[in-house]
């Protein structure tokens, strides 16, 4: 859930993008009305995001609980052999020193407040009293642990880092913002091409519009969209989520662009031409508005996940624990306010419309959906730019967490405390950041003048909230895994 909040926060609040000029107006004038496969319209989302969600999310993500993210940036690429690394200085990530991270986040001895520990002990006593037979052999206990581990992994939508690995380090997201790094060209295209061509249910015979790695077939994209509309709603939704995630990344790159550099300072700001190149209807042969509409679709998914997870966070045993009691209490209060606001949205995405019908076919489709998104999360370890890899892992983890919340076989409300903790581990933070960034993307002053990245911030919050930082967690399994790099036209 932390991940959800982090990501939602990052999507929602990270950057203001001033897009003056006729081309920018054209970009947004085309993004109106009802979204495909949804009962919601763009205007309702804009109003709700800018007025109700954005201010709370922005404040929440600046807190210590959400700004520190533990990640392993040294995993090898599982799909191809490539030992090259980005040599650009803006690709570097500065990890935190041990004394910069609050003790409550990094030390297991600080994970539980006195109240939460007492509540957890009472729950454990009740469980023991109700147990039929508490004596298990070592072999049986090991088998049960392996079974539970397999069960947890089979329920995930993304791959997660091992937080206990010596390679995992805390990163301050505020000091390592997502922005343009100079990472582009063939290597960045290779990442996105692998995602779109091999992990979006698309046959190679169907050409994706504006793909720089494909030969020019003269297709104006109509063939691709005929194929897309012929898909089942679940696979169509999958493509739109990936496209929306890609759009959010490119909005960030355009919003935080290195405009000038000298011996004394670096000037970061909005690069209007970069934004237009990616989203203007004329410059993208009609693709730009579609990308922006997919960003709104992604926002609805993240928002619905935050609303659905509310019952868990209302439990008295749940704490956002950093060791700073007053601040922790304030953060939990603010988080609950945010989740209640999310729940109040009048036109939520109806997740029950997906994976419906024949149960056997629906289960097979969901498993394909899950495995394909897991693959995409693994591709993040192939990104050579470490700054891009950081934000890629965070955002895929945030979206993966949102999907788990919406489509897991286990109902959130029915989970006992310990199982709940496993959902709330690393994934929670990512989702929150993801939502935050997405919301920033959508937070536009006067609708056209300023574009803010909102989806990523929500993802960050979701990831963080599901991270191993929840106070009540006595037997928590590690979960972590989200994209940000050069755009494939």
Curated annotation (Swiss-Prot):
Q: Which Pfam families match?
A: ERO1
Q: Which cofactor does it need?
A: FAD
- Do you know which InterPro entries this protein is assigned to? Ero1 (IPR007266), ERO1-like_sf (IPR037192)
Q: Which residues bind FAD?
A: 179, 181, 192, 243, 246, 278, 291
Which residues are noted as glycosylation sites?
Answer: 271, 375
Query: What is the enzyme's class at the highest EC level?
Result: oxidoreductase
Q: How does it sit in the membrane?
A: Peripheral membrane protein
Task: Return the GO cellular component terms, semicolon-separated.
Answer: endoplasmic reticulum membrane
Q: Which UniProt keywords apply?
A: Disulfide bond, Electron transport, Endoplasmic reticulum, FAD, Flavoprotein, Glycoprotein, Membrane, Oxidoreductase, Redox-active center, Signal, Transport
A GO molecular-function term, please?
thiol oxidase activity
| PTM per Swiss-Prot/TrEMBL | The Cys-86/Cys-91 and Cys-385/Cys-388 disulfide bonds constitute the redox-active center. The Cys-86/Cys-91 disulfide bond may accept electron from protein disulfide isomerase (PDI) and funnel them to the active site disulfide Cys-385/Cys-388.
GO biological process assignments: protein folding in endoplasmic reticulum
The UniProt activity regulation field reads: Enzyme activity is tightly regulated to prevent the accumulation of reactive oxygen species in the endoplasmic reticulum. Reversibly down-regulated by the formation of disulfide bonds between the active site Cys-86 and Cys-123, and between Cys-91 and Cys-96. Glutathione may be required to regulate its activity in the endoplasmic reticulum.
State the compartments where it is located. Endoplasmic reticulum membrane
Which cysteines pair up through disulfides? They are: 27-40, 29-38, 77-382, 86-91, 86-123, 91-96, 200-232, 385-388
State its Enzyme Commission number(s).
Answer: 1.8.4.-
Q: So which residues are the signal peptide here?
A: 1-20
Fill in the subunit field for this protein: Predominantly monomer. May function both as a monomer and a homodimer.
User: What's the stated role of this polypeptide?
Assistant: Oxidoreductase involved in disulfide bond formation in the endoplasmic reticulum. Efficiently reoxidizes P4HB/PDI, the enzyme catalyzing protein disulfide formation, in order to allow P4HB to sustain additional rounds of disulfide formation. Following P4HB reoxidation, passes its electrons to molecular oxygen via FAD, leading to the production of reactive oxygen species (ROS) in the cell. Required for the folding of immunoglobulins.
Record-stated family: Belongs to the EROs family.
Official protein name in the record: ERO1-like protein alpha
Q: What is the lineage of its organism?
A: Eukaryota, Metazoa, Chordata, Craniata, Vertebrata
């Amino acid at each position: 859930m932390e991940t959800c909040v982090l990501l939602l926060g990052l999507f929602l609040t990270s950057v203001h993008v001033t897009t003056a000029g006729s081309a920018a107006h054209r970009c947004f004038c085309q993004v109106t009305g009802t979204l495909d496969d949804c009962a919601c319209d763009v205007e309702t989302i804009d109003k709700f995001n800018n007025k109700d969600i954005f201010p709370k999310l922005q404040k929440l993500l600046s807190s210590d609980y959400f700004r520190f993210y533990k990640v392993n940036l040294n995993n090898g690429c599982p799909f191809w052999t490539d030992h090259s690394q980005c040599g650009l200085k803006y690709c570097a990530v500065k990890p935190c020193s041990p004394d910069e991270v609050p003790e409550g986040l990094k030390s297991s001895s600080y994970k539980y407040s006195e109240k939460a520990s007492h509540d957890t002990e009472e729950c454990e006593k009740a469980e023991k009293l109700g147990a039929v037979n508490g004596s298990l052999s070592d072999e049986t206990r090991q088998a049960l642990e392996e079974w539970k581990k397999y069960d947890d992994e089979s329920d995930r939508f993304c791959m997660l880092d091992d937080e206990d690995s010596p390679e995992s380090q805390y990163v301050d997201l505020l000091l390592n913002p997502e922005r343009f790094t100079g990472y582009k060209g063939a290597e960045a295209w290779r990442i996105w091409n692998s995602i779109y061509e091999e992990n979006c249910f698309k046959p190679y015979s169907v050409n994706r519009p504006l793909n720089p790695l494909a030969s020019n077939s003269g297709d104006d994209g109509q063939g691709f969209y005929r194929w897309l509309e012929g898909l089942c709603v679940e696979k169509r939704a999958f493509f739109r989520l990936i496209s929306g995630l890609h759009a959010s990344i490119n909005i960030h790159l355009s919003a935080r662009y290195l405009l000038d550099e000298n011996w004394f300072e670096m000037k970061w700001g909005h690069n209007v031409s970069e934004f237009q190149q990616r989203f203007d209807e004329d410059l993208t042969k009609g693709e730009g508005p579609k990308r922006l509409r997919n960003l709104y679709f992604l926002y609805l998914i993240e928002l619905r996940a935050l609303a659905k997870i509310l019952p868990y966070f209302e439990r008295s045993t749940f704490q956002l624990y950093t060791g700073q009691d007053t601040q922790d209490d304030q953060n939990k209060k603010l988080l609950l306010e945010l989740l209640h606001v999310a729940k109040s949205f009048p036109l939520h995405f109806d997740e029950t419309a997906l994976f419906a019908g024949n149960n056997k076919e629906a289960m097979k489709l969901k498993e394909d959906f899950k495995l394909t998104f897991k693959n995409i999360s693994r591709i993040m370890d192939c990104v050579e730019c470490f700054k891009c890899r950081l934000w890629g892992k965070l955002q895929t983890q945030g979206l993966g967490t949102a999907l788990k919340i919406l489509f897991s076989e286990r109902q959130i409300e029915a989970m006992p405390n310990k199982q709940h903790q496993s959902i709330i581990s690393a994934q929670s933070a990512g989702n929150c950041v993801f939502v935050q960034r997405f919301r920033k993307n959508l937070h536009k002053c006067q609708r056209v003048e300023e574009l803010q990245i909102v989806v990523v911030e929500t993802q960050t919050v979701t990831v963080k909230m599901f991270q191993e930082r929840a106070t009540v967690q006595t037997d928590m399994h590690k979960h972590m895994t989200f994209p940000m790099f050069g755009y494939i036209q």
